[in-house]
Amino acid sequence: MFVFIDNGAICHAPTHVSSSLFRFFEHLSNSNLNAAFEALLGLSEDTLDEKKKEEYMAKMYDIYHDFEMRSVGEQSLTQIMMKTVRCAVEDAGAVFGEEAFPIIRALMYLDGLVIRTHPDVKLISSMSPYLEEFRACLPIPEPVPRYIN
């Protein structure tokens, strides 16, 4: 069992929130952008038609253009995360709820720490082995995206 302790909060995230965010970061760390963006749709309360989904995906690809090529010293992971949340909320009807923000905030703290200590690191891709370890030890269900083909 993994227990995360954030200096600012002890909380529980509902399965659809933790699963969607886990899958998002897992796919992102493996440079599978399409699957990462699809995973965030597990937070959507809207049913997206194909056009809305295409618009959402296009905006996400714009946000993450060259993302995997740059280190934390070359880009602000915190700003990218805020753009991601905004796009998911505005274009896909995602509802993160207050339970998601300790997870996001912890990554922002990590981003700040890495910028100061190891600015050449590609933070998200370096998370991949640890996410594989989580997957091996935790039952993480697949998020169910809501959109119409």
Predicted region positions:
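Conserved catalytic cores of large enzyme domains
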Residues: 1-149
